[in-house]
Each structure stands twice: as structure tokens, then as C-alpha cells.
Amino acid sequence: DTSDLPEIVELESSDLASILYTSGTTGRSKGAMLTHGNLHSNAVALTNCWGWKKDDVLLHALPIFHVHGLFIASHCALLSGTPMIFLPKFEVNEVFERLPDCTVLMGVPTFYTRLLSLSSLTPDYVKHVRLFISGSAPLTEVTFREWKEKTGVEILERYGMSETIINTSNPLDGERVAGTVGFSLPGVNLRISDSEGKELPRGEIGTIEVSGPSVMKGYWRMPEKTKEEIRQDGFFITGDLGVQDEEGRVSIVGRGKDLVISGGFNVYPKEIESII
């Protein structure tokens, strides 16, 4: 008897799956409308880019009211049908105790700085973990270097946001450069543009814009704001300032609204932080 089972509804990839509220640095919260197609395309891209395996075990201690914990981390495991150790919150000692039981840890930079404070963190202790991923906030070059020195493993940093999910990632196999967020994912078109949307040459700082199957449908009940943020050619204006090297590797230098002009020179927050 299947009468008590929930009804199975036919869905299109363009159907709305989630509304994630985000304010960024612009004040009023905006509801980013993500479709089933957005979520699926990004999950497939990440699963492939990060080489998800059938014997992988994800250690999940991220909040699920945020795109990082709700979609980015959990969808890789769900799509691959692999186990997930789901912790209600990040507690440094509990996460440390579960590290030998996992193969992948996704976290924010604070996870890694707090774990680094533990003297018992050694290469042998984390030998089963093949991938440490960081996002949602910039990972400092100091943390990147200290983690490698203490564990023998390089953290993989990536870059994304609620409106686009993940845009770029450092490579699974290949050089991971401290202070960078890697290359655009397959299917993601990324450009560095001036204020008019004109693409800038490699090496010049400008606004990061992205297009592709993971870019949101728009902002919930905010059509004018949607038109402001998504250009007619489909590129979403992230508001983040960045630069690409000759290989296409992306570095983020700050938010456009945080730029300071002093004596005719552009001063970027990341430059100040690196000096301090």
C-alpha cells in the first residue's frame, strides 16, 4: 500500500528550489532564488573537480542556514551516496576527535586556525584525510603555510557566494597557491571587468563577474535589483574585486565598496591586511 507515501512531483531544472537571504555588504537582505538546475550543476561540477570517491566520508560541522553547509558540503556527499558525519556545530575538540574517521573536511578559515592551536595535530593523525577545503572567508597565507607545515597537507581554497554557489577552486591535482582561489569551475564563465562591464586584460584589477548554469534566477520580488546585478549577457556582478594571472588563476583583493582612494592611488583591503 503506497497511499501514505508523499506524492512524487515532476520538476523542471528551472523550478525554484531555494531562496537564500543574503545582504553581503549592501544592507537590506535579498532573497537569492536558486533553481534545481543551479544546485545540480554545481554539485556535479564540485564532485568531479574534487574527485569525490565512493569511500569518501565527509566531516560536516558547518551551519546549514548558509549556502556552504546547506548545499556545497552536503550535496557532494548526497550526490555521490557517501557517508556524512553531521555535527550540530563546530566544536574544536569534537571535530579533532572525528578527523581520523573522515576523508574530507569542509570548513571556514576559523576551523583551521583553531585546529592549529592543538599540539596533537600531526601528519600521522590526519593521514586518512585527503582533502581539507576552505571557503566563505579569505584564508590567510599564514594559515595556509602553517597548516601545511603542521599536517603536510595543503588546504584547498575555493570561492563562491549565495547567488552563484561555487565559482572557482584551487586544483585537486596541481599547485595550490596561497592567497588565491584557483580557476573557474567547468561551465563557469568568469571575467574581470571595469564598471561598464568591459573585460580587462589579465593582471588588471577589476570586478569579478560570472555566468553559467549555477547563477541564480534572480532576487525574490526584487526585479529592479536583479536587473542591476545581472547584465543582459547573463553575467552576474559579484561586487568582489579580483585579478587573474596569465594562467587564469584568480585572486580576490576585496569588495568594490571597500576600495579606498588615497592620493590618487587605489588601496585594497587585502594589501593592507597582508602588510599588517
Where are the model-predicted features located?
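Conserved pre-ATP/AMP-binding loop-to-beta segment of ANL
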Residues: S3-Y21, R28, G51-V57
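Conserved S/T- and glycine-rich ATP-binding loop of Class I adenylate-forming
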Residues: L16, T22-T25, L58, I64, ...
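Conserved AMP-binding A3 loop
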Residues: A17-S41
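Short beta-strand->loop structural element characteristic of the AMP-binding/adenylate-forming
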Residues: K30-M33, H60-A61, T82-K89, L156
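Conserved AMP-binding/adenylation subdomain of ANL enzymes
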Residues: H40-V57, F65-V104, L118-S120
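AMP-binding/adenylate-forming catalytic core of the ANL superfamily
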Residues: E97, G160, G212, K217-G218, ...
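Gly/Ser/Thr-rich phosphate-binding loop
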Residues: C102-G107, L116-V177, N189
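Conserved beta-loop-beta connector loops within the AMP-binding
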Residues: R191-E209, E228, Q244-E247
